[in-house]
Structure formats: structure tokens, C-alpha cells
Amino acid sequence: TTSNHGWYILKSEDGKCDMDYYNMAGEKAENVLLASCGRQLEGDQAERITVGTNYADPEDLDPKTNTFRKTTVLFPVSNRDAKAVRLSTGKIINDFPEMFQEEPAEPYAPGMAFATSMAQFILNQGKVYYFWPYTSALSKFSVELARNETFDPYRISKYMMYATPNPIGFDEVSTSFVAIPGNRTTLISMTDMPGTELSANHTQMNLLWAGSKGLYDIEHYAVMQEQQDPSRKFIAYITCLGNSMTIKRDNLESTDPAYGASLFTLNHSSSQILYFVNGHELWSRSIAAVPGVNSKLEVVLPEGEIVFIKHMPYSVYGKPEESFDYLLIGAVKDGNYEVVGYTLDAVGRPADPEPALHFAGKGKVGDVTFVFPNVSG
């Protein structure tokens, strides 16, 4: 197959979402879902592509064990839909309602799917669902997790922090950070560690963005805005130990380029860097200490509105020629996307102002991922 070693670009176009695929030879397959299955994702906003491993394939029954064989899938997610797509063929094996034990509430609004070593998670209308990929015979998402024992209303933001032992989400109803377990029926309220500058609970903040440098890290970052005074924004330096956290504030002046930024991503390698986009400018910000220090990156950016940013490192042991370390930027102009990748140097800055990677197609890019035959979530 040629569908499991290359680049997938999740995009929106004409009120639908689909994926373009580029293999390692540079060959392009447009609208993979439409071409292979005759249907696309509903929704006009492409959100995220997640990889799921050990997913029970409902079309591949093992007659000896009477169980479904496991496979690797992509979860392309829009603001209105998500599907399970077999990586080896690019074909849809489960539509959104088929991915659940019980029919999910309508209108469908996933927005986010993510995985940890323990469980595979998905959102719908801000509610959390999960299953255990290694032990689940059917790979069906559970009934929704409750906020607490009193079933208070909640709505989890699409921005996640990958802490240990549980990922950390933000409840937009109570404006509180919560741990999202893959082994119980309720979310877990975070507790404050000594020295925190902001309680994890009832923050009275809007979460504009959040992320982690890597899986199972203790250091995380967020961009937050005060609800009572929306002109006040800050970068939150978050340390998580178990289900406790401490938050330090790096307040942003209105003249700071990060104050008016529209997109953020972290460097996921060794560098303590936050990248962001302000207008048609690309910036980096050292987050090794408070306050952070900004630096404008002089690179040749694609034309049009910049709508996507992501750091994507990939290392193959003993094969440096197959490894890469890209800062990806996506733009849209006249209904067409352009995605470029800048090779980063050892300190996390573009080694060359010209991009080393380039993709172009129809639609507006929402996410980009790289896959290979033994990829895991």
C-alpha cells in the first residue's frame, strides 16, 4: 500500500472536510475519503488528525477467536464529524455514531480526539468518552464521563495537555482545569500546589490555547484571558504532578507581539520555545523563564492568511537521512491551501529562510500529520 507512509493534510472545502495524501515519492491523492468511500466529513472546520492503534476492525473477523482483528486507524476530526479510517487502505470503517457504545448526542460536535498509553479519547459537545485499545474487543467509546458525582454540567475545551498519569483539560463551564482519566466514570478536579499564582479551579479565565512539549511531561503552557477584563492576557507556565498543579503568570502587554497572536505551537524537542503567528509574521518566544523573550523569525512565508502552525520532529534511529525536524506553516488564499515546512536547527530556529517542504491543494488546512507503517498514537 502507499497510504501508510507519507503526509496527510486535513482540510475543509465547500462545507465538507477531507484529507489529501502525499506519499514519499511526492505523489498526491486528493480527497482520500471521497475517492475511497464516496463520502466526506461533515463540517466546515477541519480540526485534527489523530492516530489510533489496536483498533478493532469491524470488517476483519478472526473466525478462530471470533474477535475482530486489530488495526491502525486515523481519526480525522472536524467541528461536526469524525471517522475511523483504516490506515492501510484509507477507507472509512466507522462513521461517527458507529464509534460509540450508545448513540452520541446530536448535533455532532467532536472537535478533538486524542490518545494516551492507557486509552483513546474523543469529545462530543465538550463531553469526554474513552475506550481501552488494548483490551476492548469492539473499540467503542464509552458513555460520557460525568463532571463529578453530582453530575454538574461541563464542556471540555479542544486544547489538551498531556500530563501523567492523566491528560489535563479545561472545563469552560466552571473555568477549571480537570484531569481526564481513562479508568473511571468521572473527571478529576485538580488541586493547587503551594506557590501557585492562579488556582486551577474557577479561574474566571478564557482558555485561548494550551499545549505540552511532549507526552507525559510535567511542564505545560497555556494562553489565557481574564473574563472580567478581556484586555488582560498572559502565558501560563503550568507544572503538573499527579492531579495537582501550579501556575505561574507571564503577563502580556498589549504591545507584545504574543498578545495579538492568533496561532501557537510548542517546540516538542529540547528547545524551550513557543512559536506564534501575529498577522503575517512568524515569531518565537523563549519560555525557559518568566518573562519570555520574543524573536521575529525571518522566513519566506506562504501567501494568504496563515491558519495553521505545528512543530513536527521525526527521528529514525541510525537513519538520519529519513529523520526531519520541521516547523509547519499553513496558509489559505483564494480557496487553496499551501503548507510549508522549515527545517529547524539545534536551537529551534529555521536553518534556512526558504522552506524545505511544500504542499499545495484545494481548501483550507486544519491539521497535518506524518504516518509510517508502524506508527502509534
Give residue spans per PLM region:
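Loop/turn-rich, solvent-exposed surfaces of beta-rich toroidal or solenoidal domains
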Residues: P257-G341
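Beta-strand-enriched, solvent-exposed domains that form extended recognition/catalytic surfaces
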Residues: T1-N4
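Blade-level signature of beta-propeller repeat domains, shared across WD40, Kelch, NHL, RCC1
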Residues: Y326-G377
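Acidic, serine/threonine- and glycine-rich low-complexity intrinsically disordered segments
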Residues: D81-K296
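Repeat-based blade/solenoid architectures
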Residues: L41-E47, N201, T255-G260, L301-S315, ...
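Conserved, compact domain cores that house catalytic/ligand-binding motifs in diverse enzymes
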Residues: W7-D81
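Hydrophobic beta-strand positions that form the internal "hydrophobic ladder"
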Residues: W7, V73-L74, Q120, P167, ...
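Short coil turn/linker residues within repeat-based beta-strand modules
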Residues: G26, T89, A289-P291, L344-G348
